[in-house]
From Swiss-Prot:
Gene name of the encoded protein: CYC
Region (Disordered): 64-85
Chain coiled-coil ranges: none
Full protein name: Transcription factor CYCLOIDEA
Keyword Nucleus carried by entry: yes
Organism name: Antirrhinum cirrhigerum (Snapdragon)
Length: 271
């Protein structure tokens, strides 16, 4: 429940101007200190908070963020390599060298024996002591480059290796082909032999069939001849009696024997 305000305050409040511009509310005469009492302090605090909140929302809408803390954390800068590089024919090289355990132990033992305090001095001593070997290496490299380039040497090595590989593969392929040919020849020989045996067996079977057929035909023919001869003997006139019948029978039997002998001779010739 708000306390009553005097008539002068009402008259001043009537003349006060409330301007609504976007989200901002401007209070002119209501915020003057000599018209307010201590009882109106909570109301003024709430209006001040409302104004601050509206101002913050207006700034956010317009793209202004007054929060001092950054929204996204910035990435840390990458630490640059402060060591200078040495440029060689194969590109830049780092001055720092990583040694294996055995080589590092030998290197530092040599450094302690020489009494040097820096590894570069030890390396300088090693290079000066190996000047002759370095010169010989440079001379050998120069002679090789004049005679044939390293690429040519590599190509020769690769060609020799490829020839060896091809020869080896050719030898293997020839051996495999020879084995296959031998197997095929043996298989073909066995097949030819089996076919020859089959043909021989077929010829023997046909001969047997022909012999059996001819024998059957001869037997049928002989039986037919016996039947014909029996009918002829039934019509013989009994003039001379027994002697004439015997003559006819003997002649018929002689003819049958000669015929059968000729047929047997033909069968033997076929076999």
């Amino acid at each position: 429940h708000l306390p009553q305000v005097s008539s002068s305050l009402h008259s001043r409040a009537a003349t006060s101007v409330v301007d609504l511009n976007g989200n901002e509310i401007q209070l002119h005469d209501m915020l003057s200190g000599h018209y307010l009492t201590t009882a109106n302090a909570p109301v003024l605090e709430s209006t001040a908070l409302f104004n601050n909140n509206n101002n913050f929302n207006h700034d956010v809408v317009n793209g202004l963020n007054r929060d001092p803390s950054p929204t996204f954390p910035t990435k840390q800068a990458v630490k640059k390599d402060r060591h200078s590089k040495i440029y060689t024919s194969q590109g830049p090289r780092d001055r720092r060298v990583r040694l294996s355990i055995g080589i590092a132990r030998k290197f530092f033992d040599l450094q302690e024996m020489l009494g040097f305090d820096k590894p570069s001095k030890t390396l300088d001593w090693l290079l000066t002591k190996s000047k002759t070997a370095v010169k010989e290496l440079v001379q050998s490299k120069s002679t090789k480059s004049n005679s044939s380039s390293p690429c040519d040497d590599c190509e020769e090595v690769v060609s020799v290796e490829s020839e060896n590989v091809t020869d080896h593969s050719k030898g293997k392929s020839l051996k495999a082909n020879n084995k296959c040919k031998e197997a095929m020849d043996s298989h073909q020989a066995a097949a030819k032999e089996s076919r020859a045996k089959a043909r021989a067996r077929a010829r023997e079977r046909t001969k047997e069939k022909m012999c059996i057929k001819q024998l059957n035909e001869a037997i049928v023919l002989r039986n037919h001849q016996f039947e014909v001869s029996g009918t002829r003997e039934a019509f013989v006139h009994p003039v001379f009696g027994f002697h004439q019948q015997n003559y006819g029978n003997t002649s018929h039997e002689n003819w049958d024997q000669s015929n059968f002998a000729s047929q047997s001779n033909q069968l033997c010739a076929i076999l």
